[in-house]
From Swiss-Prot:
Residues modified as N-acetylserine: 2
One Pfam short name: HEAT_ECM29
Protein name in the entry: Proteasome component ECM29
Repeat positions for HEAT: 32-69, 116-153, 256-292, 313-351, 384-422, 439-476, 590-627, 707-745, 748-780, 781-818, 846-885, 945-982, 988-1025, 1030-1067, 1137-1174, 1178-1215, 1272-1311, 1361-1398, 1422-1459, 1503-1540, 1544-1581, 1649-1687, 1746-1785, 1830-1867
Protein function: Stabilizes the proteasome holoenzyme, probably by tethering the 20S proteolytic core particle and the 19S regulatory particle. The proteasome is a multicatalytic proteinase complex which is characterized by its ability to cleave peptides with Arg, Phe, Tyr, Leu, and Glu adjacent to the leaving group at neutral or slightly basic pH. The proteasome has an ATP-dependent proteolytic activity.
Any single GO CC term annotated in Swiss-Prot or TrEMBL for this entry: cytoplasm
Note: Present with 2950 molecules/cell in log phase SD medium.
GO molecular function: ATPase inhibitor activity; molecular adaptor activity
Taxonomy of the source species: Eukaryota, Fungi, Dikarya, Ascomycota, Saccharomycotina
Signal peptide: none
Species the sequence originates in: Saccharomyces cerevisiae (strain ATCC 204508 / S288c) (Baker's yeast)
Family named by the database record: Belongs to the ECM29 family.
Annotated compartments: Cytoplasm; Nucleus
Self-association and partners: Component of the proteasome. ECM29 binds to both proteasome 19S and 20S particles.
Length: 1868
């Protein structure tokens, strides 16, 4: 078959290309040809002709083989990648093979590229990578992975990093594609299949989180596979590339790129490699986008997988991470389908942590978006999902063991199991709480109750909370469920925990069960449900826990029942008044009969135990039911408020309406249940019957049974009383048998009950036996008879009683009364019984008179403080007409005024009402306890006689000046109108009574004041309409007129009885903190234009703190107030002027600092103002003006009250109402903060805090406030806050608060505050110094005086600035500012740094500069010069900490400075260091600045390194150790290699040295000299000759001129140079001569101190090049110096000797040599000489020509001198040195023949041995001498005998093991 010309042509081209590649005979040619022919060759793979393609494949096979054998050959990678992306083909050609093979070869070529070349390819590879598809995209991605595998990340936050991001040029699509694939790559796990090289790649596996397609992309499509190690390498590279490369500059929150980065980091943070920790840390840099839809959806998709594309869920550890994020996201709760799958996966997981997080997620969803847990909102596939969740949780609990957790092998760790089970219970509660349907059938409630009862104690609180969360559902349960719930609660509450006392956990579980049951009872059933209330009563059993009892009583008290139910009503909006119970409504009680029926039924049931134990409370509640049923819907004193219990207890005593209503109700009761109930009460009261058998079922004693029985018997019908006849024997038996043991109260109750029943059965045998009274009967029998007979008389039932019996009774009583051994109080109470009911009328007048006389004689002297005697006396007065002196009764009672007991005085008041009104007294009428008795019968028998007389006597007492009489009269007057007020004789004198009470209001005694206030209330009630009107007007007048002190005797004048000078309080009684209020004038001054609150509000309102309530008797008067029944509000509505004056003042006084005043005022306000909020709104402006005025009042109470009131006012009203007066309000608020009174300041602080919050809300543009309005508010307020009333105020509290307010505004309203940023930054910076505590400033200034380092204090001050909230605020201001503000901000920072005075403000300025550089690096560049100049200027500040702060700022500024600026200020720093006036501090600051530049602007430092490095090198040798350390640190960090760096910058170093080594500052000269020495160690001979010469020239020139302290360092430098460059010196005669001359000159100087220092250096110099002249000169100078040493001390000692007497000399002489020997000076001199001699020995040893024998002789002579002179006293140092010098001299030669040398050595030995050969010489010296001797023996035989003999002598004198060993070593 013929081939076409195109095909042939193409094939020819392929063959040519293949030939050209094949004939390349070297790798270089092969590489060149590849660059040219390989890409075109690959294009032919797209040929339509198969033969051409086959030819290409064949060529490629050969090519690849050859390429593999030539690893050095580079492939045209860039061209291949470009071709793979856009092959140069016709549109119809298939480019697949071209692309794939281009990428295959490109991938091979990448392995051969350098790191730099690889990096250059990155932009090409990533550009448009998102547009590639399929295999091409996979291979390109793999190429990218290979490129970044060894990529070196730039430094964090550096310019290089920013440049790299721009270099990549990655568009948004590319970024998204790469981030998506990088994220997926971290989910990849290696295939478990072992890959063999010939085997094709597998594409058949998935990973958690990756589908088949996803895995294939990384493996099959890319043509690669990974093992674990390779995978980890690539992951590490990807992480570096993403976090420090392509995504490094992402800072915009919620941007798409940021979201993709966070998705990536989430996945990486759970990776199995150690990258997880790095990712977790990196994530912390950014806010988690919890509410970003894309991010949350991505996580949810990862968690649940995708069935559509076959992607499974991710691993459990990543699921846990995802759930921990979803648990904080609101958006995550919005997708029902996702929630369904998430919960299902989590709850079915075997991983404990995942299950726990799932439970938390369910709770999270339930809390925020419960409907999405609801089946209705889920997809059809997840029907009944909510039910599934709770069922699943319940099943899990069952599986773990239920009702008690069972621990088994499958159970996780105990703590883990406990926590998870707790969470399951809590989750269950959360779901049930929000789903009524689940609760309505009670199955879950039963389940939880059973769990609570039986599960482990650790779960108790969780189960209990879950149950309690359901109470909101209970009230709406269907009726059937409620019945079921009742049975459940009955079962729970009737459990007897005492049967399980041995098991404490079980008891606690039962208690928890009961507590929840009581809560359920109160929530589920209405108050009128008798069974529910019985459950409450069961809860009050005394063996229950306190909280159960408390909760049970709340269910029995209607007020708390309402409050409780209001608070649990979650389904509806509840009024605050309902929550507080302040809106009083009437709650219906269970019907009395129904409750009795339920109670009796329970007592008859098998489970009666619990009812019996709580019987006392059941009876108490039954009484409350009875009263409440009777008065339901009626106005009485029984208001259902928090004091309802007290009210209902006292109601039958004090409220006639209650009595009549109860009477009506009880009269109609006579059924069997009622009789059974009364019998029960009697049985419980008597406990045993007449046969002695136990009939009580309540296990304890309680007086309630007798009390309730007696109460009921007061109202029952005669028919009922007759049915109760059977009770009499048991009651009578109780009195007779237990007379001595029963309490007085029980005896009275029992006898009264018998008396009442007897009235209905007068003809019964029981009554006849009781009334048959004989003289000889017992006291018990008399006791009962005294109660029965008078009541029979009242009912006119005495016809069955023998006349003698009554007389016998009276005689028995008088007999007992006169008998000394009887209980007089009891007998008197019996006398009361027989007298008060008129029984004495049954006997003759004479017998009556005799009886009265006997009793009166017995008690009239005992009337003071004996209440029973007083009562008896009043009852005797009923028969006063039978006596001659009837006035005696009132006289004796009036005499009791001396008593100080309030209750007793009230008793006297009651008695006076009886004496005056007889049976017209309400007090006596209330004593009748017989049902249906007509009191008028008794009133006719005992008419009122002397009401007016006694009232006049009381008036007289009221007008008395005697305090005790006044108090008694006040109380008696109160009693009088209470009990006799209904009589015309009393009501006609209302004006007089009113006047007396008004006067009592001003009394000092609070009890009198309260009594008077209550008296006024009673007068108001009984007075006529005229009196009421005048009283109300007088009261209003007292409120609103300041002339309240004007004297008036009118009854209408509120202050008529009080003058301005009337003393109300003893000094000190009413202490205000600023002195005591003592006169009425003081009181009037407390308020502006308002009468005195202490007299009006406090006493006109009977608050519960009233003194009356503290008295047992007085409490009867503590009802209501004068305002309570008035219609003042109508009057206020009619009289607007009065209202405008009264309401603002009334409002203010509600907040009076005195609690009594404020409480009373609140009572009056609540009474006058029914609609409080409406009234406040109506009179808002008047109230506001009053309060602002009051805040400036001179009285602290007014100021404090006004401030508290205004605080309340502005919180309750919209801001628009007071916005116009905001500045005035702020001014007054700040004024109160600076008040002289601490309590006013405290309230002022609270007020300003609230103002600040209101201000923040009103300007918050982020919350929708109009920006224009916000700016308008701030334009007014901000100048105020930073003006003289705010930040610049004299008061510290005000300053601090203004500052706090501004900080809060910046924090919470950044948008609104933005335009004011520059001004605020300036103010805040300058404020730092003002707010610093003065004590710190003082301490810093006077640190030296307290021995404290000022720098330490300054460091703390600096730290205080950095950590200050104020500085954080500045930072926030800068972060929120715009580029356009930059110039203004920089100008204010410069201004602040120049104008600030204190350290904190200056430091703050420097820190602000740093923040600006960090935040606005690009925008800062134009201003860097100005700021650098400021920094340099601040180096001149006197405070080192300030200098350092600006030095650090300079480092940051270099980062944004142009090169010319950097060079300019670098040179200025160098100049500053070398200034002649430069101090250590200046040098330290320069060093800190350089260090800062190095750390924060590395690239800029490198640009000016040639300026800095010479200085750093030189400064490393500074004299100051701290500076030396600082600069050495900088040098180490800045130089890559020490010696190399020195060589690099040597010319610059030499230039700096040349300029500064001759500085006028000698310390700089020293530093330079030491630097030359250091240079010698850091360089070698290889440096250029001119530089060596320059070094010598620098040193020589520096030595010119006089000697100075430290000049020796330059000599040392010159010597070091000579040693280092000895050959150069030797080759240059001129140089050598010049050095010789300089050295000779320096050694010849006259300053011996200087010459002493340089002489050893001169010896070192000679050692380099010994010459005869220089050696001779050295010997001469050295000998001269050694002779001078010690001369000064000798002279001084000589002078001492001359002036001391002989005795002193003799005393100190033995110690003189020892003292001198060990002196520091002697040791220094000795060591100096030894050092000089040793250097001289080195000269001898280094002499290359003739041996300098003269120098040797000098050395030996000087050793001898050291041993024998008296100026330098030798020590072991010289002894040791002599031997060491000998060893050095002799040891140099192998053989010695010179006679002179041998002679000198012998002389040295002879000098050394005698000194060292004694017992005192230390061992080391002797050992060294033996070594010296051994060397002589070895090298000088002629001296051997002498030496050996000496050494043997040494051994004999002092032989030690070490000496013997050393001798043995040398052959001895």
């Amino acid at each position: 078959m013929s081939i076409s010309s195109d095909e042939a042509k193409e094939k020819q081209l392929v063959e040519k290309a293949e030939l050209r590649l094949a004939i390349a005979d070297s790798p270089q040619k092969f590489e060149t040809n590849l660059q040219t022919f390989l890409p075109p060759l690959l294009l032919k793979l797209a040929s339509p002709h198969a033969s051409v393609r086959t030819a290409v494949f064949s060529a490629l096979k050969n090519l690849i083989s050859r390429i593999n054998t030539l690893p050095q050959v580079q492939l045209p990678v860039r061209a291949l990648i470009v071709q793979a992306k856009e092959p140069n083909l016709a549109a119809q050609q298939d480019s697949t093979n071209v692309r794939l093979y281009s990428l295959l070869l490109a991938s091979k070529g990448i392995d051969r590229l350098s790191l730099q070349d690889r990096q250059q390819l990155l932009p090409l590879v990533v550009s448009n990578i998102s547009c590639l598809t399929g295999t091409v995209a996979a291979r390109m991605f793999h190429i990218l992975l290979k490129l970044i595998l060894e990529w070196v990340a730039p430094q964090e936050s550096s310019h290089e990093q920013e440049e790299f991001v721009q270099f990549l040029q990655l568009d948004n699509d590319g970024f998204s594609f790469l981030m998506r694939q990088f994220t997926r790559f971290f989910l990849l796990v290696p295939s478990k299949q072992v890959q063999v090289s010939q085997q094709p790649l597998s594409r058949g596996y998935t990973c958690p989180g990756l589908s088949l397609t996803d895995v294939a992309f990384f493996t099959y499509d890319a043509g690669v596979t990974f093992n674990k190690e390779q995978l980890n390498k690539f992951k590490k590279a990807i992480f570096q590339f993403v976090c420090r490369g392509m995504a490094a500059t992402q800072t915009i929150e919620q941007s798409p790129r940021m979201i993709e980065l966070m998705e990536f980091l989430c996945v990486v943070s759970t990776d199995s490699t150690n990258l997880s920790d790095d990712a977790a840390q990196f994530m912390k840099r950014f806010p988690m986008p919890y509410e970003n839809e894309e991010f949350i959806t991505f996580l949810q998709t990862l968690y649940i997988g995708n069935t559509a594309n076959g992607r499974p869920p991710v691993k459990a550890i990543l699921q846990e991470k995802i759930l921990s994020i979803l648990n904080r996201s609101h958006f995550a709760t919005t997708k029902a389908e996702c929630i369904s799958l998430i919960c299902s996966i989590g709850l079915h997981s075997s991983e404990y942590k995942l299950r726990s997080l799932t439970l938390s997620f369910i709770r999270h969803v339930a809390k925020l978006n419960y409907k999405n847990l609801n089946p209705a909102s889920s997809s059809p596939s997840s029907t009944d999902f909510s039910t599934c969740i709770v069922s699943l949780i319940r099943n899990n609990l069952h599986a773990e063991g239920w009702p008690k957790l069972q621990l088994g092998p499958q159970t996780p760790a105990f703590n883990t199991a406990i926590l998870q089970r707790q969470l399951q219970y809590e989750t269950l509660g959360d779901i049930l709480k929000r789903d009524f349907e689940l609760v309505s059938d009670l199955s879950y409630i039963e389940f939880l109750f059973e769990s609570l009862k039986n599960d482990l104690p650790q779960f108790r609180s969780s189960i209990q909370e879950s149950l309690l969360s359901l109470v909101g559902h209970l009230s709406i349960l269907p009726q059937q469920s409620k019945l079921k719930l009742k049975n459940l609660l009955r079962k729970n509450l009737s459990i007897d925990e005492q049967q399980r006392e041995d098991n404490n956990d079980a008891v606690n579980s039962i208690m928890a069960l009961k507590f929840v049951s009581i809560k359920f009872t109160n929530a589920a059933f209405p108050f009128h449900d008798p069974e529910a209330r019985l459950f409450n009563i069961w809860g009050t059993v005394r063996t229950n826990r306190f909280d159960i009892i408390e909760e049970s009583f709340k269910g029995l008290q209607p007020f708390w029942f309402r409050v409780n139910n209001a608070s649990i009503n979650t389904s509806a909006t509840v009024k605050t008044s309902d929550l507080l119970g302040s809106h009083l409504s009437e709650t219906e009680f269970p019907p009395f009969r129904e409750f009795l029926q339920v109670l009796i039924d329970q007592l008859d049931s098998e489970a009666a135990s619990i009812t019996r134990k709580s019987l006392n409370n059941a009876v108490r509640f039954s009484k409350q039911c009875l009263i409440s049923n009777a008065i339901y819907g009626k106005k009485t004193m029984v208001i259902q408020d928090e004091d309802w219990s007290v009210r209902i207890d006292k109601a039958l005593e004090l409220d006639d309406t209650v009595v009549s209503r109860v009477n009506e109700m009880v009269q109609g009761m006579n059924d069997d249940i009622f009789i059974r109930y009364l019998t029960l009460l009697s049985n419980e009261f008597t406990a045993t019957n007449s046969k002695g058998e136990q009939i009580a079922i309540f296990p304890y004693q309680d007086p309630i049974f007798g009390s309730v029985l007696l109460t009921l018997l007061n109202f029952v019908s005669n028919n009922v009383l007759r049915r109760l006849e059977i009770l009499v024997p048991d009651l009578y038996h109780l009195v007779i048998m237990k007379f001595q043991s029963l309490s007085d109260n029980d005896l009275a109750v029992c006898a009264t009950i018998i008396g009442i029943i007897s009235t209905a059965i007068a003809d019964s045998t029981h009554v006849k036996r009781i009334t048959k009274i004989a003289q000889s009967q017992t006291m018990a029998e008399t006791y009962v008879a005294s109660y029965v007979v008078p009541r029979l008389y009242l009912k006119d039932q005495t016809n069955h009683i023998e006349s003698d019996s009554i007389l016998n009774l009276l005689n028995i009583l008088t007999t007992h009364l006169s008998h000394p051994g009887t209980n007089k109080d009891m007998i008197l109470k019996l006398v009361c019984q027989v007298t008060k009911f008129g029984l004495l009328l049954q006997v003759s007048a004479q017998e009556r008179k005799d009886f009265l006389k006997k009793v009166m004689d017995t008690i009239q002297d005992k009337l003071i403080n004996d209440v029973t005697a007083i009562q008896t006396w009043s009852y005797l007065s009923l028969y006063s007409t039978d006596l001659e002196n009837s006035s005696l009764f009132q006289e004796k009672l009036l005499e009791t005024n001396v008593s100080k007991q309030n209750d007793f005085l009230f008793s006297v008041g009651e008695s006076l009402s009886v004496v005056a009104g007889k049976w017209s007294s309400k007090y006596l009428i209330k004593q009748i306890d017989i049902p249906n008795f007509n009191v008028e019968i008794m009133q006719q028998k005992f008419p009122a006689t002397n009401v007016t007389t006694i009232l006049d006597e009381i008036f007289s007492g009221c007008d008395s000046t005697k305090p005790s009489l006044r108090k008694a009269s006040c109380i008696w007057l109160l009693s009088y109108i209470q009990y006799l007020g209904h009589l015309p004789e009393v009501s006609s004198k209302c004006n007089d009574i009113h006047l007396r009470f008004m006067r009592f209001l001003a009394d000092r005694d609070e009890f009198i004041q309260d009594s008077a206030a209550r008296g006024l209330s009673l007068v108001y009630e009984i007075g006529g309409s005229d009196l009421k009107e005048s009283m109300v007007k007088g009261l209003l007048k007292s409120f609103t007129e300041s002339t309240a002190g004007s004297a008036s005797t009118s009854a209408t004048g509120i202050s008529g009885s009080v003058s301005e000078e009337t003393e109300l309080f003893e000094p000190g009684v009413l202490n205000t903190g600023d002195g005591s209020i003592s006169t009425y004038k003081d009181i009037l001054n407390l308020a502006s234009e308002v009468g005195d609150p202490a007299l009006v509000y406090k006493f006109m309102s009977l608050a519960k703190s009233s003194a009356l309530w503290s008295s047992r008797k007085g409490i009867a008067f503590g009802l209501g107030a004068i305002m309570s029944k008035s219609s003042l509000e109508e009057l206020l509505l009619k009289d607007q002027q009065t209202a405008k004056k009264l309401i603002p003042k009334l409002y203010r006084y509600r907040f009076d600092p005195f609690q009594a005043v404020s409480r009373s005022m609140t009572d009056i306000w609540n009474t006058l103002i029914p609609e409080s909020s409406l009234t406040i709104s109506l009179y808002f402006n008047d109230i506001l003006d009053e309060l602002l005025c009051g805040m400036a009042n001179k009285e602290w109470r007014v100021r404090e009250a006004s401030t508290s009131a205004l605080l309340q006012l502005i919180q309750s009203q919209p801001q628009e109402k007071f916005s116009e007066k905001m500045l005035k309000i702020w001014t007054m608020a700040f004024r109160t903060m600076d008040d002289i009174k601490d309590s006013v300041r405290e309230v002022g602080t609270k007020f300003t805090t609230v103002l600040a919050k209101i201000l923040a809300r009103s300007i918050d543009v982020e919350k929708g406030v109009n920006p224009t309005k916000s700016k308008e508010i701030l334009d007014n307020i901000l100048p105020f806050l930073w003006g003289p009333h705010g930040l610049n105020s004299d008061a510290e509290e005000v300053r601090n608060f203004a500052l706090t307010t501004l900080i809060d505004l910046v924090k919470h309203s950044p948008g609104a505050i933005k335009p004011f940023t520059p001004k605020l930054i300036y103010d805040f910076i300058t404020l730092f110094s003002s707010i610093e505590p003065q004590v710190i400033n003082y301490l810093a200034l006077n640190a030296a005086n307290y021995n404290i380092d000022a720098n330490v204090i300054d460091t703390q001050r600096k730290n205080g600035v950095t950590n200050s909230p104020l500085f954080q605020t500045i930072e926030k201001l800068i972060n929120n500012s715009d580029d356009c503000m930059m110039e203004e901000i920089i100008n204010v920072v410069i201004k602040a740094s120049r104008k600030s005075v204190g350290l904190p403000s200056k430091v703050a300025s420097s820190l602000v500069i740093i923040i600006l550089v960090k935040r606005y690096s690009i925008e800062m560049k134009p201003y860097s010069g100005k700021l650098l100049k400021v920094c340099l200027t601040m180096f001149e500040d006197r405070n080192e900490s300030v200098n350092i702060a600006f030095a650090i700022s300079m480092g940051y500024l270099f980062k944004v400075s142009a090169l010319d600026k950097c060079i300019k200020y670098s040179e200025k720093l160098i100049t500053k260091y070398f200034e002649p006036t430069s101090t250590e501090n200046n040098k330290k600051v320069v060093g800190t600045a350089i260090d800062s530049i190095l750390n924060y602007a590395k690239s800029e430092f490198d640009n000016v390194a040639s300026v800095f490095m010479p200085l750093i090198f030189i400064a490393c040798n500074d004299e100051d150790k701290d500076l030396e350390t600082l600069y050495n640190k900088i040098w180490t960090e800045a130089s890559s290699s020490g010696a190399g760096t020195v060589k690099l910058y040597l010319p610059e170093i030499l230039n700096v040295l040349c300029v500064n080594i001759k500085s006028n500052d000698f310390s700089i000269r020293k530093t330079c000299a030491k630097s030359v020495i250091q240079l010698c160690g850091g360089i070698n001979d290889s440096i250029p000759y001119p530089q060596i010469v320059k070094l010598f020239d620098i040193s020589r020139e520096a030595l010119s001129g006089r000697s100075w302290d430290g000049k020796e360092h330059i000599v040392a430098a010159l010597v070091s140079l000579t040693e280092k460059f000895s050959q150069t010196v030797a080759d240059n005669n001129d140089l050598q001569e010049s050095i010789n001359h300089v050295m000779y000159t320096e050694v010849s100087r006259k300053s011996m101190k200087y010459v002493k220092k340089i002489l050893p250096l001169y010896a070192r110099y000679i050692n380099v090049n010994p010459q005869e002249e220089t050696i001779t000169f050295l010997i001469e100078k050295a000998k001269e110096m050694i002779r001078l040493l010690g001369s000064e001390s000798d002279d001084s000692e000589g002078s001492i000797k001359q002036t001391s007497d002989e005795s002193t000399i003799k005393r100190i002489k033995p110690n003189t040599e020892i003292t001198q020997k060990s002196s520091k000076e002697n040791i220094e001199n000795e060591e100096y000489v030894i050092n000089l001699l040793k250097v001289s020995v080195d000269i001898c040893n280094n002499s290359k020509s003739r041996y300098p024998m003269n120098l040797l002789e000098f050395i030996i002579d000087e050793i001898a001198y050291l041993f024998h002179n008296d100026r330098i006293i030798h020590t072991w140092r010289t002894q040791l040195a002599a031997s060491e010098i000998g060893i050095s001299i002799v040891g140099r030669f192998s053989t010695i023949s010179s006679a002179d040398f041998i002679q000198n050595v012998g002389r040295l030995w002879d000098q050394t041995f005698p000194i060292n050969c004694n017992k005192e010489t230390i061992e080391n010296v002797k050992l060294q001498m033996i070594k010296f001797g051994g060397l002589i023996i070895q090298k000088i035989p002629s001296l051997q005998n002498n030496i050996e003999e000496n050494l043997r002598l040494l051994n004999s004198i002092d032989s030690t093991s070490r000496i013997e060993l050393e001798l043995k070593n040398i052959g001895l």
